[in-house]
């Protein structure tokens, strides 16, 4: 599959996670098959344009669209256009770049379902969908849901029987730096605070205000994207505190995770990265789709979670409980590694190319 188009979006509303996992998949497709990959995304604040271009992929921008298009989908307004219109824009934008047919279209968007897929059937050989909600119909050849303990019955009536399904963390899309990562036992009480790329609700600062005066903490590493909405405010806060180090769009996240004893962050796609690094987490739920991930990982014994509106009341106790438990028991690292091994990207791409 030499020509591939990806339809995904990022913004302060949506976050950057969809683009990041598509970048991981695109990198592996390029590595294994020398594919040319086009990212088609809507213009928006925080739309990850620079990340896509810096990775060396073709960037194709759609206009900003409308604020709240009428849709029957739970996240239909995220698309900022009716589905059929978006599909035609997608094809037209690629046509203007001299692309009239592709081998594979990858779709990672909660605002897209089977209607969009049908509209682009004459434009592509295969369709690959990334989802984790299981709340809408798909007309695709491949479906990936990397949620821990995901089972086939989740999509029983949502995809055809011919669809190749990649389900569970065995297929988690992680960057190459996590393949073969060797977690080490961490003695110092070092925390990693990381809420994804844009952190529009500024949970980073809310967390830091709660934990910075905990007397038994040795170090706090904070990770934010250069496109984070509140980067200046967080940066100013961190600069005046010796305990805290701010890392902006670092390229050594796996190392930072492996050198931390406990993380505080969202229950999104970085959950699998933390597990590969053997890093337990206090997860803060900030979106409904994170609750399924958080619940399953709490049952596995690798996280505990709180709601975002309970940070002030519950976070300090959760951190204390974890640090006490980790000082007595090393089994938590093994529990994390049982969730995800870090080789999912290779498995997915090998499956596509060998189909």
What residue spans do the PLM features occupy?
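C-terminal alpha-helical cap of glycosyltransferases
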Residues: 341-355
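A nucleotide-sugar donor-handling region in carbohydrate enzymes
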Residues: 139-202
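A short, well-ordered alpha-helix in the C-terminal region of glycosyltransferases
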Residues: 328-342
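Nucleotide-activated donor-dependent transferases that construct or modify glycoconjugates
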Residues: 2-15
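Conserved nucleotide-sugar phosphate-binding/catalytic loop shared by glycosyltransferases and other
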Residues: 35-88, 307-309
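Donor-nucleotide binding loops and adjacent catalytic segments primarily
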Residues: 189-259
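Acidic donor-binding loop of glycosyltransferase active sites
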Residues: 258-269
């Amino acid at each position: 599959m030499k020509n591939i188009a990806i339809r995904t979006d990022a913004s302060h509303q949506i976050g950057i996670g969809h683009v990041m996992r598509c970048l991981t998949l695109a990198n592996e497709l390029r590595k294994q098959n020398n594919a040319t990959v086009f990212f088609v995304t809507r213009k928006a604040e925080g739309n990850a344009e620079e990340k896509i271009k810096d990775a060396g992929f073709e960037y194709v921008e759609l206009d900003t669209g409308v604020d709240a298009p009428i849709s029957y989908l739970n996240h239909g307004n995220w698309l900022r256009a009716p589905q059929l219109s978006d599909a035609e824009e997608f094809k037209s934008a690629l046509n203007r770049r001299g692309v009239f047919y592709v081998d594979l279209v990858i779709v990672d968007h909660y605002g897209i379902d089977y209607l969009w897929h049908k509209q682009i059937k004459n434009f592509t050989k295969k369709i690959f969908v990334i989802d984790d909600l299981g709340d809408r119909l798909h007309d695709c050849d491949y479906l990936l849901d990397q949620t821990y303990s995901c089972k086939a019955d989740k999509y029983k009536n949502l995809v055809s029987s011919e669809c190749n399904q990649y389900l569970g963390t065995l297929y988690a899309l992680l960057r190459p730096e996590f393949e073969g990562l060797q977690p080490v036992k961490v003695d110092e009480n070092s925390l990693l605070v990381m809420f994804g790329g844009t952190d529009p609700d500024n949970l980073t600062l809310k967390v830091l205000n709660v934990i910075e005066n905990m007397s038994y903490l040795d170090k706090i590493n904070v990770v934010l994207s250069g496109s984070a909405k509140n980067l200046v405010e967080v940066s100013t806060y961190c600069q005046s505190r010796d305990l805290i180090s701010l890392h902006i769009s670092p390229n050594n996240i796996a190392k930072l995770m492996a050198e931390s004893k406990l993380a505080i962050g969202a229950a999104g796609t970085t959950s699998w990265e933390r597990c590969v690094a053997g890093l337990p987490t206090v997860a803060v739920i900030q979106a409904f789709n994170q609750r399924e991930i958080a619940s399953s990982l709490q049952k596995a014994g690798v996280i505990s979670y709180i709601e975002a509106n309970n940070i002030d009341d519950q976070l300090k106790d959760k951190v204390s409980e974890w640090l006490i438990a980790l000082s007595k028991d090393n089994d938590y690292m093994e529990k994390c590694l049982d969730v995800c091994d870090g080789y999912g990207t290779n498995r997915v791409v090998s499956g596509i190319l060998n189909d």
